[in-house]
From Swiss-Prot:
InterPro entries with a match to the protein in the record: GS_dom (IPR003605), Kinase-like_dom_sf (IPR011009), Prot_kinase_dom (IPR000719), Protein_kinase_ATP_BS (IPR017441), Ser-Thr/Tyr_kinase_cat_dom (IPR001245), Ser/Thr_kinase_AS (IPR008271), Snake_toxin-like_sf (IPR045860), TGFB_receptor (IPR000333)
SMART domains: GS (SM00467), S_TKc (SM00220)
Taxonomic lineage: Eukaryota, Metazoa, Chordata, Craniata, Vertebrata
Membrane-crossing residue ranges in chain numbering: 122-142
Transport in keyword set: no
Record domain Protein kinase: where: 203-504
Family indicated by similarity: Belongs to the protein kinase superfamily. TKL Ser/Thr protein kinase family. TGFB receptor subfamily.
Membrane topology: Single-pass type I membrane protein
Keywords: Angiogenesis, ATP-binding, Cell membrane, Disulfide bond, Glycoprotein, Kinase, Magnesium, Manganese, Membrane, Metal-binding, Nucleotide-binding, Phosphoprotein, Receptor, Serine/threonine-protein kinase, Signal, Transferase, Transmembrane, Transmembrane helix
Record-given protein name: Activin receptor type-1-like
EC number assigned by the record: 2.7.11.30
Residue list for modification Phosphoserine: S156, S161, S162
Span of domain GS: 173-202
Gene3D superfamilies, alphabetized: CD59, Phosphorylase Kinase, domain 1, Transferase(Phosphotransferase) domain 1
Gene: Acvrl1
Source organism of the structure: Rattus norvegicus (Rat)
């Protein structure tokens, strides 16, 4: 069959080039044109004919060949359509065939299958389109549901599963910190999601111990153990989600970081509540503690050292399978530092925290419209000069705020029988609820810092604490101390401490 095709092609070529007999067209002498002649039968590079021809032929196993010549026979070949083997072109001006390029039809693989019904595409088209739309809709719905479940920490119902919790010996934690080894999530940062839901549903709220613009804090009871339940307001959902995300993905088990137990979205009194359940510390926040108590120097150092240890743990990146990214708090203040029963501090409220990993160089800022506390904002934040794409910038703002927390501790420390009432930083320079502009004028324009009590110079240990505050408040952020340096310096100042006492 293939041989027959090539015989026909050769015949057409011969006829086209005037090499065979056919229906003779007898043009007048005036109709003859000069043509380029490039084929095996040419005696000269120029020939004369009624028209010029170009024939592109592909023979089996060979590249397509181009033949040029004159035509005077079988003019109907000029009207033929190109095929996958031959393409014939005619023109009627002298040398019009010299630079003509032709193409063959695309090669078609012979098939012995019956021809497809012409109506089949009309039937299959709408069906396939419908299937694609259904698949895309299903995929979109699945992704939306998955995102919602991830935000709420709801992956399925566990029911009333039996739990085996082991009590922790650290601090005054009332609930077990860890599940048995074969039931942990691997993060060491809390209970698995499903267990968290069960714990949350078994917690009974006992009394409200604090309120703020972003929610309430309750003392709760779980199987006779006291827990703290932070109930977020609906407008602060992103803080709840962010804190839940960090606790569930980062290794944050540390004596000086508030112990996380569970997080859940629950319904109480026909309204949705966002719960964050943590260890309960009866002394409350450092802010509350300092208003009630005065401090001996060694207790002041104990509070300062433990808070610095917590901040240093947040700021450092730990590598390895049990590692953690570096974290900047972004809302450090005495209200977000809790006092444990052993008179050590632990840092709480990670709703604005920023995470950074050196290996991926990824800065995870989160998606929280809430801003930090204006009274504790560093000058570069107030004048909007902070580099938001640089993780170190966020750590430097934490150091500024930590210096203010140290100042609050120092005011309540007894030296030579003298102590001052508790006051918040800049109490004598701005209103009780300062605006952004109030703080910007005091800190950036007037370049003021809280007044350090002169009596600190009378104590060799607390004079070192006073110097540390000044180094936390440098206007140049990069010149401030690091959390690790603060921790080591405070530990050195508190060598050979006496047993701390609370003075009423």
């Amino acid at each position: 069959m293939t041989l027959g095709i090539f015989r026909r092609v050769f015949l057409m070529l011969s006829v086209a080039l005037g090499l065979t007999k056919g229906d003779l067209v007898k043009p007048s002498r005036g109709q003859l044109v000069n043509c380029t002649c490039e084929n095996p039968h040419c005696k000269r590079p120029i020939c004369q004919g009624a028209w010029c021809t170009v024939v592109l032929v592909r023979e089996q196993g060979r590249h397509p060949q181009v033949y040029r010549g004159c035509g005077s026979l079988n003019q109907e070949l000029c009207l033929g359509r190109p095929t996958e083997f031959v393409n014939h072109h005619c023109c009627y001006r002298s040398f019009c065939n010299h630079n003509v390029s032709l193409m063959l039809e695309a090669t078609q693989t012979p098939s012995e299958e019956p021809e497809v019904d012409a109506h089949l595409p009309l039937i299959l088209g709408p069906v396939l389109a419908l299937l694609v739309l259904v698949a895309l809709g299903t995929l979109g719905l699945w992704r939306v549901r998955r995102r919602q479940e991830k935000q709420r920490g709801l992956h399925s119902d566990l029911g009333e599963s039996s739990l085996i919790l082991k009590a922790s010996e650290q601090g005054d934690s009332m609930l077990g910190d860890f599940l048995v080894s074969d039931c942990t999530t691997g993060s060491g940062s809390g209970l698995p999601f499903l267990v968290q839901r069960t714990v949350a549903r078994q917690v009974a709220l006992v009394e409200c111990v604090g309120k703020g613009r972003y929610g309430e804090v309750w003392r709760g009871s779980w199987h006779g153990e006291s827990v703290a339940v932070k109930i977020f307001s609906s407008r602060d959902e992103q803080s709840w989600f962010r804190e839940t995300e960090i606790y569930n993905t980062v290794l944050l088990r540390h004596d000086n970081i508030l112990g996380f137990i569970a997080s859940d979205m629950t319904s109480r009194n026909s309204s949705t509540q966002l719960w964050l359940i943590t260890h309960y510390h009866e002394h409350g926040s450092l802010y509350d503690f300092l208003q009630r108590q005065t401090l001996e120097p060694q207790l002041a150092l104990r509070l300062a050292v433990s808070a610095a240890c917590g901040l240093a743990h947040l700021h450092v990146e730990i590598f390895g399978t049990q590692g953690k990214p570096a974290i900047a708090h972004r809302d450090l203040k005495s209200r977000n530092v809790l006092v444990k029963s052993n008179l050590q501090c632990c840092i709480a409220d990670l709703g604005l925290a920023v995470m950074h990993s050196q290996s991926s160089d990824y800065l995870d800022i989160g998606n929280n419209p809430r801003v930090g506390t204006k009274r504790y904002m560093a000058p570069e934040v107030l004048d909007e000069q902070i580099r938001t794409d640089c993780f170190e910038s966020y750590k430097w703002t934490d150091i500024w705020a930590f210096g203010l927390v140290l100042w609050e501790i120092a005011r309540r420390t007894i030296i030579n029988g003298i102590v001052e009432d508790y006051r918040p930083p800049f109490y004598d320079m701005v209103p009780n609820d300062p605006s952004f502009e109030d703080m910007k004028k005091v800190v950036c324009v007037d370049q003021q810092t809280p007044t350090i009590p002169n009596r600190l110079a009378a104590d060799p240990v607390l004079s070192g604490l006073a110097q540390m505050m000044r180094e936390c408040w440098y206007p140049n952020p990069s010149a401030r101390l690091t959390a690790l340096r603060i921790k080591k310096t405070l530990q050195k100042l508190s060598q050979n401490p006496e047993k701390p006492k609370v003075i009423h």
